From Swiss-Prot:
GO terms assigned for molecular function: protein-lysine N-methyltransferase activity
Protein name: Ribosomal protein L11 methyltransferase
Function statement: Methylates ribosomal protein L11.
Disulfide bonds: none
Annotated keywords: Cytoplasm, Methyltransferase, S-adenosyl-L-methionine, Transferase
Length: 313
């Protein structure tokens, strides 16, 4: 590799950060960094302080975000860029605003990568009670804060996206000490980890992607939890028994496909917490939930995204 990395960048909208990050994880990138002007502001409020005043994207607050991925210098740059462009177009066809949708690339020296990408990740309050921190950062919990430790270099981001925040807030509200929680499409495992830290009797994370499963298992290890398990496969194929809560932070189309299986995996009166739903897809999801025997209890909004909490009748 000769100390060289490939950096691929997508200039996009804040709405598309999560799905575009997913593209890069699917391409087995070695790490992903996000420059979001809405997050990377120097701010003094609250116990956590960010100091990103040197980042030029601050001049464009709210206009666009930049998602960067890093690959080995030995990887096929032309192929990576071609697939990225194709996948970005697919995201746009799903109705997600991709903003400029510009794909760029560069080759950078290894020392630049090593020194640059970690500076974007600092401890962050995703709710009033829960803090997510990268594994290399020190953080002392305040009062009754719960700290989730992640390795964001492995896959699936830092857990600060709006959809993740809303799911965690819902888990805070509904998880009880005798709860069994299934996290479907678990990615980094952050939602299963949050459920376990909130006191669930058992949290199970499930994902079809072996990279996600490896990432989630590593993150579970970082948090030293014994009331959580990560499994590879489809929900009903790999999980025995039923849950009190199923949480899925995916996209609306996949949620609709999953809903019937989720109804079979829940105890009567159990809750389905789901996010990754843009405004234009809310009616589609609520209609499918009704069709599968759910009563919609909450539709929460954060930015361009929605989180639905539904109860199995």
């Amino acid at each position: 590799m000769n100390g060289v990395w490939i950096e691929v960048r997508v200039i996009t909208s804040c709405e598309a950060i999560e799905p575009i990050s997913g593209i890069f994880y699917g391409l087995n990138s070695q790490g992903v960094a996000v420059e979001d002007p809405n997050d990377l502001l120097t701010r003094d409020q609250g116990p956590l302080t960010w100091d990103f005043a040197d980042i030029n994207v601050l001049e464009h607050k709210g206009e666009f975000a930049v998602v960067k991925a890093y690959f080995s210098g030995d990887d096929d740059l032309e192929k990576i860029v071609s697939i990225t462009k194709e996948k970005v177009k697919e995201i746009q066809e799903m109705g997600i605003d991709i903003g400029k949708g510009i794909v760029e690339c560069d080759k950078i020296k290894e020392e630049d990568w090593a020194n640059n990408w970690k500076k974007y990740y600092k401890p962050s309050n995703i709710t009033d009670r829960i803090v997510v921190k990268p594994m290399w950062e020190e953080y002392s919990p305040k009062n009754e804060e719960l700290v989730i430790e992640l390795d964001p270099g492995m896959a699936f981001g830092t857990g600060t996206h709006e959809t993740t925040r809303m799911c965690v807030k819902a888990l805070e509200k509904y998880v009880e000490h005798d709860s069994t929680v299934f996290d479907v499409g678990c990615g980094s495992g952050i939602l299963a980890i949050a459920a376990a830290k909130l006191g669930a009797k058992l949290a199970l994370g499930v994902d079809l992607d072996p990279v996600a499963v490896e990432s989630a298992k590593e993150n579970v290890g970082l948090n030293d939890l014994d009331n959580i398990e990560i499994l590879e496969g489809n929900l009903l194929d790999v999980i025995d028994g039923k849950a009190d809560i199923v949480v899925a932070n995916i996209i609306a189309e996949i949620i609709c496909i999953l809903t019937d299986d989720v109804s079979k995996a829940l105890n009567k009166g159990g809750l389905f917490i789901t996010s990754g739903i843009i405004h234009e897809r809310v009616d589609m999801v609520t209609s499918k939930l009704d069709e599968c025997g759910f009563e919609v209890m909450e539709v929460n909004k954060d930015g361009e995204w929605n989180c639905i909490v539904a109860k199995l009748k």
